[in-house]
Design a protein with these regions (language model features):
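Cyclic-nucleotide recognition modules
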Residues: 68-125
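His/acidic/aromatic-lined binding-pocket segments of jelly-roll/cupin-type domains
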Residues: 28-29, 45-50, 69-70, 173
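Glycine- and acidic-residue-biased ligand/ion/polar-headgroup-sensing regions
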Residues: 34, 45-56, 74-75
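Short beta-strand segments in beta-sandwich/barrel cores
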Residues: 27, 36, 54-59, 101-102
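Short phosphate-coordinating micro-motif centered on Lys-Gly-acidic
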Residues: 37-42
Length: 188
C-alpha cells in the first residue's frame, strides 16, 4: 500500500491518519499473465491502479478484430470507464500481458473517498484531467499524424513499452500493419 501513498502524494499530501482511513477502500489483487481483469459483456466493477505489470485495454469488433485503446503500466489507472462509471456491461477487455499486481477500487468506494476526503477529490480530479489530456492527444495523433510520427511519439512517451510489448500489439495500437511497424522500427 505504500505505492498507493506515494502515488497520492505526487498530487496532494496526506497524513498517516488519513492514509489509514483511505487504505480500506482498496483491495490488492495479484494477476497472472494472460489473465483478464475485465471481459466484454461482464460488469466492470473496478477501476484499477497498477502496482506492477503491463496491461492491454482493448475491444473486439463484430469481426473479431482487436482494437487497442490503451497500454497501462506502473502507477497508471485503467478500466472500461464507460461501463465503470455507468455501471453497465463492459465493451472493453483488460488483459494482463505480464504478471502483475493491481489495487482495485469500486465506484462506490471512489465516490465515498471523494466525498469524505477533499484531498482525494482533488487527486481524482487531477488524474481524470490527465486522462482526458492523454485521450485527446491520442485522438489528434491518430487523426493527423503519419505512421512515422505516431511511432516516434509512442517511442518517446513510452520507451519502456517499446521494449516489453510485442510488436504486433504496438502496431495495432498505432493503427499500422506489422510490416509498416517493422520498417519504422528498423529506421529509428
Amino acid at each position: 500500500m505504500e505505492n498507493l501513498r506515494r502515488h497520492i502524494e505526487e498530487i496532494t499530501s496526506i497524513t498517516d491518519d488519513e492514509f489509514e482511513l483511505i487504505k480500506p477502500f482498496f483491495t490488492i489483487r495479484k494477476v497472472l499473465k494472460n489473465q483478464y481483469l475485465i471481459q466484454q459483456g461482464e460488469e466492470a466493477k473496478y477501476e484499477f491502479l497498477i502496482i506492477r505489470g503491463i496491461f492491454r485495454v482493448f475491444y473486439l469488433d463484430e469481426n473479431g478484430k482487436e482494437h487497442i485503446v490503451q497500454f497501462a503500466t506502473k502507477n497508471w489507472w485503467m478500466s472500461d470507464y464507460i461501463a465503470y462509471f455507468n455501471q453497465k456491461q463492459a465493451n472493453m477487455n483488460v488483459l494482463c500481458m505480464e504478471a502483475g499486481e493491481v489495487l482495485c477500487l469500486t465506484l462506490e468506494g471512489r465516490e465515498k473517498l471523494a466525498m469524505t476526503f477533499p484531498k482525494m477529490e482533488h487527486f481524482f480530479r487531477v488524474k481524470l484531467t490527465n486522462g482526458y489530456l492523454s485521450l485527446q492527444q491520442r485522438i489528434i495523433s491518430l487523426l493527423s499524424s503519419n505512421p512515422q510520427q505516431r511511432y516516434e511519439e509512442f517511442a518517446n512517451n513510452y520507451p519502456n513499452l517499446i521494449q516489453k510489448v510485442p510488436k504486433k500489439y504496438i502496431a495495432e495500437y498505432l493503427g499500422v500493419s506489422r510490416e509498416t511497424l517493422s520498417r519504422l522500427y528498423s529506421g529509428s
